[in-house]
Structures are given as structure tokens and as C-alpha cells.
């Protein structure tokens, strides 16, 4: 489950007097119990959970309420660490570390990290070789770089204060970031002193500052999966290169005797051209010189492509896909057990000495004020009731295990009426009821599908009959008006029959509304002759996407596509980080190398040739445009690298650069191809895994269960509401909480109700699907995890001098990470 980042910000803001004041007991909802010494009253695998108020951190005379507030906050931190998959050895160990932890975990710090990283990356636009329009003087960009690096130093100092030196040096990613920071600092000072730029390949390492940002957690996960998939990938890659070298040697002996064949005249050229042939960029050109001399030579190339391209490359995808599946399952298992351990830590900080059997509502309410500060008092109580499956005054550990799933619910009062028009006069009710029945009928839906299909065919025929040039008519086509009228009538009928809220709650209805609105804007653009907005008319074919709802497989494809969009964005950002690093290296070594007529001595001279010659009275220009694919600045480098990713004619760029530098330049292009092949293979494997997973789940579950979200129904009685209201009044709770509770009470009295039903909703995540897919194995994982915790407890229970705490210190977390 993803972290609600808005709640992280307010964690530090909850340290004021209003929220830290302990609630007084009322009506049995909570009693003033003393927290146990270690945050819990039970002995078990997690009985050694540390507390920020233990040891010398809390004075002997401190009131019990202060201890509870600290326990609430630390329990909330444990839950956040479980949700964010943060290792428990980074847990703040004392009040001083807690202050730094709270500062580091808020949106201000996150934005500071992100903006600093972006500033460092964007400096490549201004540094030599710079984009001409954005070039800055050396002292300006060097000063900006030093400023950004000083901010990074401040960030690392705050993390050092939070983690402590020993934990700080154990954190690998932080140490890598620190090492890069030192190198960047030295280089920036040298540039500022010398007032000139030098070869700075280490600028390619600036991506680490972006990758380490909190908002780029998806990029870190992608990089981790790429590195985890490398061992099997490298095995198949070595096999591929082995066959390539064997065929290169064979090709050299077979075709080097042909003087008209430049592809195999040396062993180096044989290897390079077979590597390019693997991408099919130079096929069949590479075959034609030998094929013209001996037709049987085609067998060599057919066998090579069959083995390398169609067998080993597909085998590579299969191996990566299998490894990716195992990694995804292992990742789900690790995160599930990590969350379970975090819940155990939080639970033992919330049980009291008087009530060691569970968490009272008072303690749960205190936890949620820190864990979900934006959650209202009514929502906190409903969350408690949703968790409390045993209907007892105390929340057991078994019930508390569902805290992540239940805390994400959005609660709303259940409407007493079925439709929005139920309270209208009878005549209006019958009209809207008929419209509701009509728009929900199968006949109406299939009629609209037929209209969309006819519209699609009409657009296709209309476009086919158009000529080149100005294809936008000066008058509005009658077909445009007819179909737009039908779509508009459908929109108004659905809004009238379903109600605006229910209509807009459907993703497909939102899509229909957007396309119809754009079509109406296109009509205005045609009517008012607004040429700059004619592009809106081209969006009409988007209506055809509605036809994908007809077939279940199409719906699954579209649903999978929409589910993949956030992850695909992070994968795209991961690819851009590789682009940035390779672009920096390319600029340092190849900047200014390519120009018109630069490669006349190479085999790709025609692609770079620029010739003016006169034919009669006219000057004719023969221009090869490949000199534009250069590394003269960061923007040109990104375009060039994208062309290399597509692989069509990528060898022309490689050979052009090689002719102006050295043969070793080919290593840069080959390495880039291999790296992008790894990333692209991971992307394909991810898409396959997500689609196959959804297909398997849809076979095991009902279709409605797959498409619908999570819905929980809970009832709140008037007595419970009055008790919570009294509790918050006596505790001087926030005015917004009291106001919402009074609004709910007035609504009950208005309709003379003794209770009110609330619905908790949230979208179904992949974690929910995985819980059902692996439900048989999950119990085995839990049992194995419990045994590991017991063994760890036995190992940690032996007394040793190292286990004795000094005054002012705090016991470290003994959790399995």
C-alpha cells in the first residue's frame, strides 16, 4: 500500500500542546492506564521493543500522560516504517534523534531534497558544453552548484543526527551519496578557482541525488529489481556474446577474402557488424557483398539470426520474466512480514499494564492522532470498530494486524435513499426513474456502442477521402453535429438518471464526459474559425475506446494498462536517469566531433555529407542530416540517445563518432545498447507479470470482485456518538472534531435515528490481490516468521555485558529486517 504523504507532514506538527494533551476517560471508552516499562505488558517475540521514554529520557516525576503521548508517537513511527519499508535499525533511538527524524520525514524536507537534486541535474544545461540560449558564466554555475551541494550537506547532517554515526555508515545508499557529494564538492571548488571547466565525467553521478529523494522511491525499487535480475541476465548475455564471437571468427575466415566486403575484413569489424546485425539495423546490407559473390553465404546470416535473435534473445526475456516473478513474490513476502513486525512493535507500545490483553479505544485514538493526523474523530472510531472483529472493548493483536488496510478507508455516511430523486414529487420521480431504468438497460448500452462504431467507420471513410494539405473544412460537417448531439443527449440522460455524484464516480463516464466536452470545444473552434484550436477536432476518434468495454479481455487489458501507468512513469524516470548519465559521458568525450562533411573517410560518409552544386540557374543542396545527431549539449544528447534506443540506423551515429575519435568509442554505444536492453527487458517483464497476474486472479475470483473496490459497512449508535463527543469535550479536543461529531448528532436527530450506517471505501490494490492469490502460502510465511522471532528472542535473552545499558542510552530494536 502506498504511503499517504500528506500525513507525514503533520507528524511534526502534532507536538503542540493541544494535540499532546492526554484525553480524559469517559464512559468507558478509555481509562488512564500506565504504559508498561517497555511499552507492552506481554512477553513475546517483541517484548524488547524500545521506547523513547525509557531510561534517562523520561524523568521519574513525569506524568503518565507524557509517557503515553511518547508511546503513541513512537508506535506511529513504527507503523510508518512498516508502510515505507524502512529498516528498523534506522528507528530514532532517543529524543534528540526523534526531533531530527520528524524534520527529515515531512514534505518540506522532501521538497528540499527534490528541488536540490533537480537543480544539480539542470546545471548541465548551463555548464560547458551548454545549450546556447542557457549558457552561464563559469563562476555563476559553479556558485549554484556549491549552494546546492551545501544544501545536500545539511540534509546529510540531519540524517546523521537522526541515525547516529554507526547506523549512518551502515546505510549503503547514504554512504554512496556522501562519496559522490565529496567528489562533486572538490570538483566544484576546482572549477570556481580555475574559472574554467575541465573534463567532469563524474557529473554523470549526480543522478544519485535524485534517486535518493523520498518522492523517487519507485525509481529505487526499479533499480533494485534491475540489479537483482542481473545475474541470470548476465548468464544469457555471456552465452549470446559467446556465439557472436564464434560467428565473428567464422565470418572473418569465410568473407575476409572478398575485397569488396568491408564488414568482415578484420576480426574487429566482424564482431562489431555482427553486434549491429543482432539489432537488425544493418540487415541485409551486411549480407549483400558476400551474397552477391556466393548465394550460399546467406545460410551463415540466417543461422546466426535464428540462434541469436530469435532463440537467445527470447530466452533472455523468458529468464528475466521468471526471475522477475520470483522477485515480485519475494518482495511481497518481505514487505508483508516487515509490516507484520512493525504492527507487533506498535501493539506492544500501546497495551497497558492494567490491560495487557489488547488496545483500548483511548490508546488507539492516541495512536491515530499521530499516524493519521488528518483523520477526524468519527473516522478514528469507525476505524476502531472496523478493526475490532471480536466486538470486545479491547483490540487484539490479531485484529490490529489489519491496521494498514482499514486505516486507508474513506468513510462516508450511507444514504437512506437509493436514488438521488427519491424525495422528489411523484411525477418528477417517475420521470427520473424511467430515465434511470433506460440508461442502465443493456439495450441502451448496445445502442450507444452501435453509434460509436458507426461514428468510427464514418470518421475512417471521411479521412480516407481527404486529400493532403488543409484537411480542416471551413464549415461544420453535418455528421459532426449529429453524433455530437447523440453524445450530448446520452450525457444529460446519464446525469439525470444516475445523478451527478454517481455519474462522475465511474472512470468510463469521466472519459465519456471529457471526450464529449472536447468534441463540443472542437465544434466551437470550427464555428468561430479558431485555427489554433483545430487540433481538438482530431480527438474525436477517442470515442472508439468505449468499444473496448464490450469484451472482457479488452477490459482486462485496459484495466491493467491504467494500473501500470504509475509504475510505468517510475520506469520511464529510471530510463531517464540512465540517459542522463550516458549523455554526460557522451558530451565529455564526443562534444563538437560531428559536423557536415565530417566523416568523408568512413563507410557512412553519405549520411554526413553536405554539398552545394548548381544545376542551371538553381543551387541544389544534397544534405545528410546525421550530423544533427550529436553530443554538443544535453538536449541534443538526449535526442541522440533516444535514436540509439530505437536502434534503426544507430550504427551510422556510432561509425560517425568512431571515425572522428577512435575505435574504442564503439564501447560507449555498445554498452548503452546493452543497458537499455536490460531496462527494456525489465519493462516488458513487468507488463507481462502484471497482465498474467490479473488474468490468473480474474480466473480465481468473480469479475465483480476484481473490478470493485473494498467496501466495509459499520454502524455507529447514538450512545457511542455521545460518548465520543463527551470524551473530546472533556479532553479539549480540536474544534473541527467536535463540530463534525455535532453535525452527525444533529443529522441523527433530524431523521429520528438511533444509529447511522457508514461505508468505508478504498480502491483494490495489487497488495489486496496478492493477499488472496497467496493466501495458502501466507500462513506458512507467518509460522516461519514466528519461529524466527522465537529463535531470535532466545539468542537475545542471554545476558551479556554489551546488553547492559548506560544512563541516557536506549535499547536497540531487535527486530528481524
Swiss-Prot record:
Its main location: membrane. Residues 264-287, 631-654 dip into the membrane without crossing it. The keyword Transport applies. N-glycosylated. The keyword Cell cycle does not apply. Keywords: Calcium, Calcium channel, Calcium transport, Coiled coil, Endosome, Ion channel, Ion transport, Lysosome, Membrane, Repeat, Transmembrane, Transmembrane helix, Transport, Voltage-gated channel. Residues 123-137, 194-202, 257-263, 288-298, 467-480, 528-535, 596-630, 655-671 are extracellular. Pfam families: Ion_trans. One of its GO terms (molecular function) is ligand-gated sodium channel activity. Residues 1-101, 159-172, 222-235, 320-445, 502-504, 551-574, 693-817 are cytoplasmic. The chain crosses the membrane at residues 102-122, 138-158, 173-193, 203-221, 236-256, 299-319, 446-466, 481-501, 505-527, 536-550, 575-595, 672-692. It is a multi-pass membrane protein. It catalyses: Na(+)(in) = Na(+)(out); Ca(2+)(in) = Ca(2+)(out). Dimer. Interacts with MTOR; the interaction is required for TPCN1 ATP sensitivity. Interacts with STX7, STX8 and STX12. Interacts with JPT2. Found in a complex with LSM12, TPCN1 and TPCN2. Each of the two internal repeats contains five hydrophobic transmembrane segments (S1, S2, S3, S5, S6) and one positively charged transmembrane segment (S4). S4 segments represent the voltage-sensor and are characterized by a series of positively charged amino acids at every third position. This is Two pore calcium channel protein 1. It comes from Rattus norvegicus. The lineage of its organism: Eukaryota, Metazoa, Chordata, Craniata, Vertebrata. The gene is Tpcn1.
Amino acid at each position: 500500500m502506498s504511503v499517504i504523504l500528506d500525513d507525514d507532514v503533520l507528524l511534526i506538527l502534532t507536538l503542540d500542546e493541544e494535540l499532546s494533551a492526554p484525553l480524559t476517560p469517559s464512559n468507558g471508552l478509555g481509562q488512564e492506564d500506565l504504559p508498561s516499562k517497555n511499552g507492552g505488558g506481554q512477553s513475546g517475540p517483541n517484548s524488547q521493543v524500545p521506547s523513547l521514554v525509557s531510561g534517562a529520557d523520561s524523568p521519574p516525576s513525569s506524568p503518565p500522560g507524557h509517557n503515553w503521548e511518547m508511546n503513541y508517537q513512537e508506535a506511529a513511527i513504527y507503523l510508518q516504517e512498516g508502510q515505507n519499508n524502512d529498516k528498523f535499525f534506522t528507528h530514532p533511538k532517543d529524543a534528540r534523534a526523534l526531533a531530527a527524524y520528524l524534520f527529515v520525514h515531512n514534505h518540506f524536507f522532501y521538497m528540499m531534497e527534490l528541488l536540490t537534486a533537480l537543480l544539480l541535474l539542470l546545471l548541465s544545461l548551463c555548464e560547458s558544453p551548454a545549450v546556447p540560449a542557457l549558457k552561464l558564466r563559469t563562476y555563476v554555475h559553479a556558485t549554484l552548484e556549491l549552494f546546492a551541494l551545501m544544501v545536500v550537506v545539511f540534509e546529510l547532517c540531519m540524517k546523521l543526527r537522526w541515525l547516529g554515526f554507526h547506523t549512518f555508515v551502515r546505510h549503503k545508499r547514504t554512504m554512496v551519496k556522501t562519496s559522490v557529494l565529496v567528489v562533486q564538492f572538490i570538483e566544484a571548488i576546482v572549477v570556481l578557482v580555475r574559472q574554467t571547466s575541465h573534463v567532469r565525467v563524474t557529473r554523470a553521478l549526480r543522478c544519485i541525488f535524485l534517486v535518493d529523494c523520498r518522492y523517487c522511491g519507485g525509481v529505487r525499487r526499479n533499480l533494485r529489481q534491475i540489479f537483482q535480475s542481473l545475474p541470470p541476465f548476465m548468464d544469457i548475455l555471456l552465452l549470446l556474446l559467446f556465439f557472436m564471437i564464434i560467428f565473428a571468427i567464422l565470418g572473418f575466415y569465410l568473407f575476409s577474402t572478398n575485397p569488396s566486403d568491408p564488414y568482415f575484413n578484420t576480426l574487429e569489424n566482424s564482431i562489431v557488424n555482427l553486434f549491429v546485425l543482432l539489432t537488425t539495423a544493418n540487415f541485409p546490407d551486411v549480407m549483400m557483398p558476400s551474397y552477391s559473390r556466393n548465394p550460399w553465404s546467406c545460410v551463415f546470416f540466417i543461422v546466426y539470426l535464428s540462434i541469436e535473435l530469435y532463440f537467445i534473445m527470447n530466452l533472455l526475456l523468458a529468464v528475466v520474466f521468471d526471475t522477475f516473478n520470483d522477485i515480485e513474490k519475494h518482495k511481497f513476502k518481505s514487505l508483508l512480514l516487515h509490516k507484520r513486525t512493525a504492527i507487533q512493535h506498535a501493539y506492544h507500545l500501546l497495551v497497558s499494564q492494567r490491560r495487557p490483553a489488547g488496545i483500548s479505544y483511548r490508546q488507539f485514538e492516541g495512536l491515530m492522532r499521530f499516524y493519521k493526523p488528518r483523520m477526524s474523530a468519527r473516522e478514528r472510531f469507525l476505524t476502531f470498530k472496523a478493526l475490532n472483529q471480536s466486538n470486545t472493548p479491547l483490540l487484539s493483536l490479531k485484529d490490529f494486524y489489519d491496521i494498514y488496510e482499514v486505516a486507508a478507508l474513506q468513510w462516508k455516511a450511507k444514504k437512506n435513499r437509493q436514488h438521488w430523486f427519491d424525495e422528489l414529487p411523484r411525477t418528477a420521480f417517475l420521470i427520473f426513474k424511467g430515465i434511470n431504468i433506460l440508461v442502465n438497460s443493456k439495450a441502451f448500452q448496445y445502442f450507444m456502442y452501435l453509434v460509436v462504431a458507426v461514428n468510427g467507420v464514418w470518421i475512417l471513410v471521411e479521412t480516407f477521402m481527404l486529400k493532403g494539405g488543409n484537411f480542416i473544412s471551413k464549415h461544420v460537417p453535418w455528421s459532426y453535429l449529429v453524433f455530437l448531439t447523440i453524445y450530448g443527449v446520452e450525457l444529460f440522460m446519464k446525469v439525470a438518471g444516475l445523478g451527478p455524484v454517481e455519474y462522475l464516480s465511474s472512470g468510463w463516464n469521466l472519459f465519456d464526459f471529457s471526450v464529449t466536452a472536447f468534441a463540443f470545444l472542437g465544434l466551437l473552434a470550427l464555428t468561430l474559425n479558431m485555427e489554433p484550436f483545430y487540433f481538438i477536432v482530431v480527438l474525436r476518434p477517442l470515442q472508439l475506446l468505449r468499444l473496448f468495454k464490450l469484451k472482457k479481455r479488452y477490459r482486462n487489458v485496459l484495466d491493467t494498462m491504467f494500473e501500470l501507468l504509475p509504475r510505468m512513469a517510475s520506469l520511464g524516470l529510471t530510463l531517464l536517469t540512465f540517459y542522463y548519465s550516458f549523455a554526460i559521458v557522451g558530451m565529455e568525450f564526443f562534444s563538437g566531433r560531428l559536423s557536415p562533411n565530417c566523416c568523408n573517410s568512413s563507410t557512412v560518409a553519405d549520411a554526413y555529407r553536405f554539398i552545394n552544386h548548381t544545376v542551371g540557374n538553381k543551387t541544389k543542396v544534397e544534405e545528410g542530416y546525421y550530423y544533427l545527431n550529436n553530443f554538443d549539449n544535453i538536449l541534443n544528447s538526449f535526442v541522440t540517445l533516444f535514436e540509439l534506443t530505437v536502434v534503426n540506423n544507430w550504427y551510422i551515429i556510432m561509425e560517425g563518432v568512431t571515425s572522428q575519435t577512435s575505435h574504442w568509442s564503439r564501447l560507449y554505444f555498445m554498452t548503452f545498447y546493452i543497458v537499455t536492453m536490460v531496462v527494456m527487458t525489465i519493462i516488458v517483464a513487468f507488463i507481462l507479470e502484471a497482465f498474467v497476474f490479473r488474468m490468473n486472479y480474474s480466473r480465481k475470483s468473480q469479475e465483480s470482485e476484481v473490478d470493485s473496490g473494498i467496501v466495509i459497512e459499520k454502524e455507529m449508535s447514538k450512545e457511542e456518538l455521545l460518548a465520543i463527543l463527551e470524551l473530546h469535550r472533556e479532553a479539549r479536543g480540536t474544534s473541527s472534531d467536535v463540530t463534525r461529531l455535532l453535525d452527525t448528532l444533529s443529522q441523527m436527530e433530524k431523521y429520528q435515528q438511533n444509529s447511522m450506517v457508514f461505508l468505508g471505501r478504498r480502491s483494490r490494490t495489487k497488495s489486496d490481490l496478492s493477499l488472496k492469490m497467496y493466501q495458502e502460502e501466507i500462513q506458512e510465511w507467518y509460522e516461519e516468521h514466528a519461529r524466527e522471532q522465537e529463535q531470535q528472542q532466545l539468542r537475545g535473552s542471554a545476558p551479556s555485558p554489551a546488553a547492559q545499558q548506560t544512563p541516557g542510552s536506549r535499547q536497540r530494536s531487535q527486530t528481524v529486517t
